[in-house]
Amino acid sequence: MKNSKKRLLIAGLASSMVLSMAVPTFACTGIIVGKDLTTDGSFIFGRTEDYQRNRTMRLVTHPRGEIKKGDKLVDVNNGFTYIHKEDSLKFFSTPDSSKKPKDMEQGVYDAAGYNEAGVGIFCTVSADPSDEVLKADPFVKDGVNEASMTTFLLAHARSARGAIELLAQTIDEKGASMGDIVAFGDQDEVWYMEIYTGHQYVAIKYPADKFSIFPNDYWLGGVDLTDKENVIVSKDIVEVAKKAKTYKETADGLMDMAGSYGPKEIAETSRSRVWSGIHDLDPNSKVPYDAERFDLLNDLSEGSEKIDITHALNVFRNRLDGSEFTPSDNKAERKANPKTHKRPIGSINTMQAHIFQIKEGYPKEAPGLMWMTLGSPLNIPWVPIFPDINDSTPEAKNNSPVYDPNSYYWVGSSVNDLVSGNREALGESTRKTVTDFEDKIMKELPQVEKEWIELYSKDKAKAAEFSTAKTMEWEKEVFDLEKGLQKELSQVSKADLIDHWARKPIIDAISKKLMVGTSDLKFSPNEKITRGEFITILGRLGKVDTKKYAEVKDKNIEAGKFYTEYMNWAVENKLLPKTSKALANENITREEMAYTLAAYLKLIGDDTSTQKLVVFDDEKEISDWAYEDIQFLANKEILSGTSNNKFSPKANLTRAEVAQIISKLDK
């Protein structure tokens, strides 16, 4: 998934206003496993959706006829329109919130789902063509893109091939506004399609004996464009590439699609994902990390085992497992460490993931399951969604555009954040909780499937009621599990610590109960800290017996507050400078903190002598009463300057800075 405006920018069609827009990183990853390579004969295909994590994800059902013949679909992002030629089929999808902020793309982004004709669809894994082919066939400003295509395809497609043909016809008539990869499946076949430029595309019927991992680049190699049964292709696919002087052929004389339309080099974020995904599914693969090209269609190597659904689901949790690389979800961190830090498939930035499993023995109009997580599957269980459901839980369809404690997406995403804030301590145990639940579902599923298939053969309406009830039961169980994890993990981590410079000392302070969050989920590391908060933290570090300090020691100390006894302790032991007036709710300055820390260390018998003079460029701004204390603490390397050799004595302390200082004191 990605911002379609970026595609127009690359094509040279965007205005200068768009040039200044910040475009979020996109990193969707697709998977296909042919039925000959799976343990049970299932055909598997799906993707992760990675983009802006503040976009609420939902599971929504649409009854037959919800969209009427003649209704107009309008993509408010770019003006694309589609007139529905008939009433819509029944379908379900996984769209964004319909209440998104004005500064966010307002498209529907139905993303993935099944319809009642038995067609499973996901849209899209985005990709960039080369500049040369875009000049030859630019994107169309109001052309079709991922924000709208899933809606009309699920509403009307009656087969996987029919979905490809409908999308191809739409591109022929209206053009495309971005580069995309899509996959559609039904009981008989799975189709894979690459959309390259404004009017050029190629789709293939996916072979049953291959597997693929496809991040955000083009991967199709040689394609026989004359094979009408297995290939659907735009009419000018050869001419445009030749016009752009990028046309390439394979050794056996077939048009090389990625070579002709893709960029000259694979993006590093794609390289790390395709390589790790191939080696995950095929442990005996010899494909090197630095390969010039990665094939779309892969064989299982000799000695590698067939793939079951659990294995396929876990690919979307792969964090470069067993490799020499360090997984990193942070673009700046990867840029600073390009040789060691790589973008993994399993990422905190995944908004949702879906894997279709076309299964043997299922009805033609309901040919398989869609396994789903709303939020990243790293720490959220996969749930199987039956294709004929009538509804989802209130939590799963919660439309809130911001955090809501009753939202499946937001609660699960907060658990992912909490784990990422303290992955070393929480990652393994949380994952076990999640996979234990998935094991439970896997054990229940065969009997549920048997009952549902029997019902479906007799009464489709009752079968839909049954599958809806069971799916909602699992959704509710997952929501309750995630709520429990949220409550448990928030005691030892917070959701706003990911990639923060003080993450480790903050986690240490939380685990030792020296500091607490500003809410159940937030630590607010960059907020200023008050005098009362700082003294309370210091008192906890010193294991102060608060019962001894119940008597109020200063008229400015308010009784009955969390800090009352600790402030009394500080006043009695002269830990506060006179300038503070014992006002607990004022923000504390860096020089006052130095005075208080030095007084505390003297109180517990620490050596307060200094060995050398530490010079700060702004030392004239330091108050006389704090100068020696700052020297003492700088000598002990408990305190340092802020930047440019300045101490910034009058600046306020942040909660993160306090955690860092406390971690040094506690050693």
For each feature predicted by the language model, list its residue ranges.
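Glycine-rich, aromatic-lined ligand/substrate-binding cores of catalytic
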Residues: 246-361
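Bacterial N-terminal signal peptides
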Residues: 12-20
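Feature responds to low-complexity, polar/acidic, surface-exposed segments characteristic
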Residues: 490-504, 511-591, 597-627, 640-652, ...
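A contiguous strand-loop segment
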Residues: 28-145, 166-291, 296
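Substrate-recognition/cap regions that form aromatic- and gly/pro-loop-enriched pockets
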Residues: 329-454
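Sec/Tat signal peptide C-region and signal peptidase I cleavage site
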Residues: 23-27
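Bacterial N-terminal signal peptides that target proteins for export
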Residues: 2-11
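Histidine-centered catalytic/metal-binding microenvironments
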Residues: 430-492, 510
